[in-house]
């Protein structure tokens, strides 16, 4: 009979850990949380010191009964849930749900599921860390306060299936703010001017870029200015004024944190944050490897630390020495510096054993699991390697009073780039043809002027949103992926070609939250709340202080919104469309996916159809109405009502005015009207409305 009971979170770990520990240990899984706040009520009483009321999660009764049977048999119980706040809270709930007060109970944690790590954790068993538990409990209660109090209010007042969340509402606002920036952006014209010059004795010309005058750097803002510069240099002598040789190093990247893994997997592998975390969970919990059984391939996946254990540092140094050579090794990598709290009981995400090279286990892993493992393996090896080294040359060329420059680089030593390159590492070397000496004269061949327009800020992708959330202090490693998944699932945002767009539903929800609950969607407020939760974890802040300060203000805001938001209840709006089934005038209704037309004769008549909002502008192709439409994923655009017969379509709202230069439609962008033809580039201010 087993003398010791080990309780883990995931059933996927049970077999592996039991194999490590032997017959004296019984290993069972809690399958996540076993207790939570009740769904049907707030779950705590503000009048009684905010003490939470936890109940057994529906469906967990039989599991707890099985665990209690094993508890009775065991001399010692080891709570081995995940090594973070959530895991600590699950251990605490297990302690009370299983009534372990009279038993010998120990908390153990490990950052990787390997035999050494699991056995070492038994030697370092400790008590449950109540600071971690309190931090998780405070987060859970804050999230419950926002969701339970605000979501029903928005649903009742707006009638669109809206709901709110403490972190998700801020993430939505970040995306909405970017959308506003993009819509208000006015492109500005600028020009580049390259000159092709021939070096004496060389066949291939070199290309230098316009810099400015001998007095200052300057840009070119129009074709006329570019033409003027070229005309002024007609017959001019192009002379090399300065040649500088130097060196440049490109440092190795840091090993992955949760955030950087999600970003890189999105950019390189085109994985969603949710998919990345699902696959990383499998790699952490264990994969069947021929000859070894189930093996945990990476360390714990929810971390904001770049720290690496001494054992892993030693193995990396030895591995690099053997496979790449002494010169590829580097001193201990500089660790991530951050003013915010980093949960440094954790390590960076890394392979548990570098000798399990990706190519050696490729055939034993599904394709996407292999690709993610390879990415993590290469990134970690590269992070322990020396910098790449380049020889650089910069050249200044003068013609009359105008300056052109060129820069060239040649890789001298590849360092970490022999293993791993990121998107921004993939720069082509610009090698000078021949030697350039100061005061040498170059033969002019041609100018190459090009027109450009400034670009608006890019739409957020999942990767850049995660980066923004991390930089702003919104959420933590465990919340990035669930937050994005939630606002996508609720159709507040839509994803097209990796880009995230706000839907009409998202716009309405964000506007209402800004109006009624400005602090909830305030980035700084939310970041400060995260910092306070970190303070609870560190033992410097009491959890009840946070919730007791937060709830009264929220309660007051909800009561105020119940009065103020009453006026924005949306009544059915009558349309010009007549129901072809019963002859009634159809009304505009609102559903989870936006507006649609419905017959007011419901339930006798159940006719519905898509709603297209006419904007009062004629299609330039066929003369019929232009209407506002939505893509399948909810992004707004403007197209001909006669689609698919007519394919006219633009992303910005047509104004009805025509461009005085080219005759095409002018589109509304912020307080400007811009020509729909970017090559035309015409821009003017919107007419001021008369009061």
Where are these regions (language model features)?
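Short acidic, hydrophobic short linear motifs in intrinsically disordered regions
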Residues: 240-243, 251-265, 292-301, 456-468
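Intrinsically disordered, low-complexity regulatory segments
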Residues: 1-137, 211-212, 220, 227, ...
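Metal- or metallocofactor-binding catalytic centers and their adjacent structured scaffolds
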Residues: 215-254, 440
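Conserved short loop/turn motifs at secondary-structure junctions
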Residues: 82-83, 159-163, 245-254, 266-269, ...
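C-terminal or mid-to-C-terminal helical accessory/interaction module adjacent to the motor/catalytic core
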Residues: 113-195, 245-246
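Core structural elements
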Residues: 139-149, 167, 197, 248-260, ...
């Amino acid at each position: 009979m087993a003398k010791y009971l080990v309780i883990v979170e995931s059933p996927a770990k049970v077999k592996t850990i039991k194999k490590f520990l032997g017959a004296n240990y019984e290993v069972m899984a809690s399958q996540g949380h076993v207790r939570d706040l009740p769904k049907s009520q707030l779950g705590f009483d503000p009048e009684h010191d905010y003490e939470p009321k936890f109940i057994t999660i529906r469906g967990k009764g039989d599991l707890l009964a099985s665990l209690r049977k094993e508890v009775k048999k065991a001399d010692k119980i080891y709570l081995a849930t995940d090594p973070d706040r959530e895991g600590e809270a699950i251990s605490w709930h297990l302690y009370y749900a299983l009534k372990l007060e009279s038993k010998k109970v120990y908390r153990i944690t490990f950052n990787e599921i390997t035999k050494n790590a699991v056995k070492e954790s038994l030697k370092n068993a400790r008590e449950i860390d109540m600071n971690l538990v309190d931090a998780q409990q405070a987060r859970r209660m804050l999230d419950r306060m926002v969701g339970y109090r605000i979501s029903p209010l928005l649903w009742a007042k707006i009638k669109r299936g809206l709901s709110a969340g403490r972190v998700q509402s801020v993430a939505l606002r970040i995306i909405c703010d970017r959308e506003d920036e993009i819509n208000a952006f006015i492109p500005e014209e600028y020009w580049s001017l390259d000159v092709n010059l021939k070096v004496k004795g060389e066949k291939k010309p070199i290309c230098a870029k316009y810099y400015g005058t001998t007095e200052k750097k300057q840009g070119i803002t129009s074709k006329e200015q570019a033409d003027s510069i070229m005309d002024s240099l007609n017959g001019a002598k192009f002379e090399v004024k300065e040649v500088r040789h130097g060196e440049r190093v490109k440092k190795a990247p840091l090993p992955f944190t949760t955030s950087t893994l999600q970003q890189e997997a999105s950019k390189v592998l085109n994985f969603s944050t949710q998919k990345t975390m699902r696959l990383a969970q499998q790699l952490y919990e264990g994969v069947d490897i021929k000859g070894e059984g189930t093996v945990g391939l990476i360390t714990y996946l929810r971390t904001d630390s770049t720290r690496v254990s001494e054992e892993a540092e030693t193995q990396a140094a030895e591995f690099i020495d053997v496979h790449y050579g002494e010169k590829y090794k580097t001193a201990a990598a500089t660790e991530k510096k951050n003013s915010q709290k980093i949960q440094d009981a954790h390590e960076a995400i890394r392979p548990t054993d570098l000798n399990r090279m990706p190519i050696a286990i490729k055939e034993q892993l599904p394709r996407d699991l292999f690709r993610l493992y390879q990415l993590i393996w290469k990134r970690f090896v590269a992070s322990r390697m020396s910098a790449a080294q380049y020889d650089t040359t910069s050249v200044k060329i003068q013609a009359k009073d105008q300056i052109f420059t060129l820069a060239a680089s040649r890789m001298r030593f590849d360092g970490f780039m022999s293993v791993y390159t990121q998107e921004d590492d993939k720069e082509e070397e610009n090698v000078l043809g021949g030697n350039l000496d100061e005061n040498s004269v170059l033969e002019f061949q041609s100018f190459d002027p090009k027109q450009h327009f400034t670009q608006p800020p890019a739409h957020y992708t999942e990767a850049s949103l995660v980066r923004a959330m991390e930089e702003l202090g919104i959420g933590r490693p465990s919340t990035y992926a669930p937050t994005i998944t939630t606002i996508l699932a609720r159709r507040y945002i839509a994803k097209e070609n990796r880009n995230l767009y706000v839907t009409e539903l998202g716009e309405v929800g964000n506007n209402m939250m800004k109006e009624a609950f400005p602090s909830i969607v305030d980035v700084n407020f939310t970041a400060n709340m995260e910092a306070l939760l970190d303070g609870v974890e560190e033992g410097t802040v009491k959890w009840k202080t946070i919730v007791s300060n937060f709830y009264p203000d929220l309660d007051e805001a909800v009561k105020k919104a119940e009065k103020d938001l009453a006026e924005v209840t949306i009544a059915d709006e009558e349309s010009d469309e007549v129901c072809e089934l019963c002859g009634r005038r159809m009304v505009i209704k609102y559903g989870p996916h936006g507006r649609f037309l419905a017959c007011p004769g419901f339930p006798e008549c159940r006719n519905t159809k898509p709603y297209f909002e006419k904007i009062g502008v004629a299609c330039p192709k066929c003369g019929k109405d232009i209407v506002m439409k939505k893509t399948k994923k909810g992004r707004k655009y403007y197209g001909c009502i006669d689609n698919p017969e007519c394919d006219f379509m633009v992303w910005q709202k047509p104004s009805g005015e025509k461009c005085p230069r080219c005759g095409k439609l002018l589109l509304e962008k912020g307080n400007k009207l811009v020509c729909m033809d970017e090559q035309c580039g015409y821009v003017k201010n919107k007419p001021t409305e008369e009061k």
